[in-house]
Amino acid sequence: MMLSCLFLLKALLALGSLESWITAGEHAKEGECPPHKNPCKELCQGDELCPAEQKCCTTGCGRICRDIPKGRKRDCPRVIRKQSCLKRCITDETCPGVKKCCTLGCNKSCVVPISKQKLAEFGGECPADPLPCEELCDGDASCPQGHKCCSTGCGRTCLGDIEGGRGGDCPKVLVGLCIVGCVMDENCQAGEKCCKSGCGRFCVPPVLPPKLTMNPNWTVRSDSELEIPVP
């Protein structure tokens, strides 16, 4: 009895599968699917396998050698004012027309480049802005004579024309020469002072005030005044 039930169940299952196969065949369309136009291919596995000036880049479905963006000619303009830190471009090729992707402080934006010929009209080129922040000195000792290591608000750099001065007085000059050899004491070597000489300025040893000779009989009071005994 058990075997008869199993045989009947298998027969019913086979009949159901046959009906499903026939129904599916009625909805199937003739013909074969065309091959994929851009099958995923690994045409490179690293930059070293690509020709010069090409890089192994992903396509989203494989990798292929592609040209490296070379950028556009001409120069970026100088930063005129501080900009917000936004990146509106990555390379020159991401900018429209002839615009160039330039760094403006902490911002990257598409701007119209300038030509070196235009800068040459004013007799040379302006130095690039010290951005990002740079530490151009470690202390006053790392700066030239007459300069001081100062904060720029975005790093430190050597700046001249620092107010200062050295002790001593300038000697009396009899001959006046219109030659400027210094501007301030710090322009002179150690032990010298920048002194006027007629219509010029020279580095000369200063005249120091004479030292006060103390008499053994003199005493110094608590208020730093000398007390000299009357004979």
From Swiss-Prot:
Tissue expression notes: Ubiquitously expressed.
Biological processes, Gene Ontology terms: antibacterial humoral response; innate immune response
Leader sequence residues: 1-24
Keywords linked to the UniProt accession: Disulfide bond, Glycoprotein, Protease inhibitor, Repeat, Secreted, Serine protease inhibitor, Signal
Domain WAP: 26-68, 69-114, 119-162, 163-207
Record's subcellular location: Secreted
Record keyword Disulfide bond present: yes
Domain of life: Eukaryota
Disulfide bonds: C33-C57, C40-C61, C44-C56, C50-C65, C76-C102, C85-C106, C89-C101, C95-C110, C126-C150, C133-C154, C137-C149, C143-C158, C170-C195, C178-C199, C182-C194, C188-C203
MF-aspect GO terms: serine-type endopeptidase inhibitor activity
Glycosites: N107, N217
A cellular component annotation (GO) from this entry: extracellular space
Annotated protein name in UniProt: WAP four-disulfide core domain protein 3
